[in-house]
């Protein structure tokens, strides 16, 4: 079973699309050499580490609302 589960992540971030997008961007940063923000990640893969960061609250999401008018 994967940790954290999608159900657990959706308690804090309701949109699956947002979870995937943010995790992918953060995983790319980790893969490019940035250190994971979780002290002892359970996953050794960047995507798993990014999801753990989202679940623990170590990675925040900034919503940029643009007016398309």
UniProtKB/Swiss-Prot annotation:
Subunit and partners: The RNAP catalytic core consists of 2 alpha, 1 beta, 1 beta' and 1 omega subunit. When a sigma factor is associated with the core the holoenzyme is formed, which can initiate transcription.
Any one Gene Ontology molecular-function term assigned to this protein's record: DNA-directed RNA polymerase activity
Record field: catalytic activity: RNA(n) + a ribonucleoside 5'-triphosphate = RNA(n+1) + diphosphate
Organism field: Exiguobacterium sp. (strain ATCC BAA-1283 / AT1b)
GO cellular component entries: DNA-directed RNA polymerase complex
Enzyme Commission (EC) number: 2.7.7.6
PANTHER family per record: DNA-DIRECTED RNA POLYMERASE SUBUNIT OMEGA
Keywords: DNA-directed RNA polymerase, Nucleotidyltransferase, Transcription, Transferase
UniProt protein name: DNA-directed RNA polymerase subunit omega
Similarity field: Belongs to the RNA polymerase subunit omega family.
Annotated GO biological process: DNA-templated transcription
Function: Promotes RNA polymerase assembly. Latches the N- and C-terminal regions of the beta' subunit thereby facilitating its interaction with the beta and alpha subunits.
Keyword check for Membrane: no
Superkingdom as given in the UniProt entry: Bacteria
Signal peptide as annotated in the record: none
InterPro entries (UniProt xref): DNA-dir_RNA_pol_omega, Pol_omega/Rpo6/RPB6, RPB6/omega-like_sf
């Amino acid at each position: 079973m994967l940790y954290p589960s999608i159900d657990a992540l959706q308690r804090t971030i309701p949109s699956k699309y947002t979870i995937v997008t943010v995790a992918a961007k953060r995983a790319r940063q980790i893969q490019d050499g940035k250190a994971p923000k979780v002290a002892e990640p359970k996953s050794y893969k960047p995507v798993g580490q990014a999801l753990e960061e989202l679940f623990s609250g170590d990675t925040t999401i900034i919503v940029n609302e643009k007016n398309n008018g």
